[in-house]
């Protein structure tokens, strides 16, 4: 299993602007300075002025905290693999995917932890671009048989109220998150011209995991070569207002060997009481880490992680979901994540 960091930033973090020149421009300028005799005695000010003539304003973005998890198993897209699962889909998902050379066409499924925009804002992008991609999967191409998706759903709505499961991405979600997700993304997805009854199932093969109506806790097992990873949703409280509460359902990924990777996702507390055993059992923890000057009270703050967290837990934690990169004592944590970082487990 390979986990790649798409973004590490908090919901409202912003990037930075800088003045710069491109590598080709820098090479041309360097050759000009090296070869022309009049440049040999040029002052720093003259060289700086020449650079400024070429410089442009560039933006270094900060992507929201989402992840790509890859399993060595066949994907929906008719290739040998990997199966690519998104852990949350923030509003800047399309840009974050482009940063690692991927698009929605490369994604097989998504897990949604809770309905804040930095975790679901990219659902509309993922849904619409895969729905209107006739080649998203070989099964979809065969099912469409040359028809446009809107025509297929309109003309054959009795037979096909929604596309078949192998023609759309998987959506793994806890039952208590599904309703809020429907309300949040529904208006933006009800946009297939002429087709009645467009809903979340039109776009996704929904798989509810976690506690079922029967009382059973349903898990999902991913093949990973000759091995397997079991994905289980875990409950953590994120926000409590005067009248409502919002939980975030993180995931525990357990390998056949017992090796465990824990994503609590957004949590109100550094180590919620109900997750103590999960933290202790985990071999690696992807840890929510707020660095805001004024703590929000709905994320663990870096000062608490440094001063109050058990050292045995600290050593397991990879920190993310920050505004500014956290300043922590060297060696205290397993690391501070950056976009593009990748780790292979177990």
Listing of model-derived features with the role each one plays in the protein:
Residues 1-262, 313-316, 324-346:
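Binuclear metal-dependent hydrolase catalytic cores
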Residues 260, 267-346:
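Cap/insert and terminal regions of metallo-dependent hydrolase folds
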């Amino acid at each position: 299993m390979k986990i790649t960091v798409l973004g590490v930033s908090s919901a409202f973090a912003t990037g930075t602007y800088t003045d710069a020149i491109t590598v080709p421009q820098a090479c041309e300028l360097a050759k000009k300075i090296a070869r022309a005799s009049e440049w040999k005695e040029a002052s720093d000010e003259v060289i700086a002025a020449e650079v400024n003539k070429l410089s442009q304003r560039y933006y270094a973005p900060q992507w929201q905290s989402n992840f790509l998890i890859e399993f060595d198993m066949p994907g929906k897209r008719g290739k040998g693999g990997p199966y690519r699962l998104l852990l949350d889909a923030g509003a800047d998902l399309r840009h974050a995917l482009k940063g690692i050379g991927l698009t929605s066409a490369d994604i097989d499924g998504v897990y949604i932890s809770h309905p804040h925009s930095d975790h679901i804002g990219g659902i509309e992008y993922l849904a619409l671009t895969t729905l209107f991609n006739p080649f998203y999967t070989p099964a979809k191409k065969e099912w469409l048989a040359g028809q446009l998706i809107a025509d297929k759903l309109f003309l054959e709505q009795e037979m096909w109220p929604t596309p078949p499961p192998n023609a759309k991405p998987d959506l793994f979600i806890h039952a208590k998150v599904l309703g809020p997700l429907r309300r949040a993304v529904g208006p933006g997805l009800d946009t297939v011209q002429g087709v009645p009854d467009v809903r979340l199932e039109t776009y996704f093969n929904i798989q509810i995991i976690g506690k079922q109506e029967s009382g059973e806790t349903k898990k999902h097992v991913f093949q990973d070569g000759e091995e397997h990873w079991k994905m289980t949703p875990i409950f953590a409280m994120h926000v409590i207002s005067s009248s409502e509460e919002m939980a975030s359902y993180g995931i525990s990924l357990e390998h056949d060997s017992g090796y465990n990777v824990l994503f609590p996702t957004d949590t109100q507390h550094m180590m919620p009481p109900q997750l103590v055993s999960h933290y202790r059992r985990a071999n690696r923890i992807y840890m929510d880490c707020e660095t805001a000057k004024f703590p929000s009270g709905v994320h663990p703050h870096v000062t608490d992680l440094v001063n109050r967290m058990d050292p045995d837990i600290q050593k397991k934690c990879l920190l993310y979901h920050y505004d500014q990169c956290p300043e922590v004592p060297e060696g205290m944590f397993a690391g501070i994540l950056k976009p593009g970082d990748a780790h292979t487990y177990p």
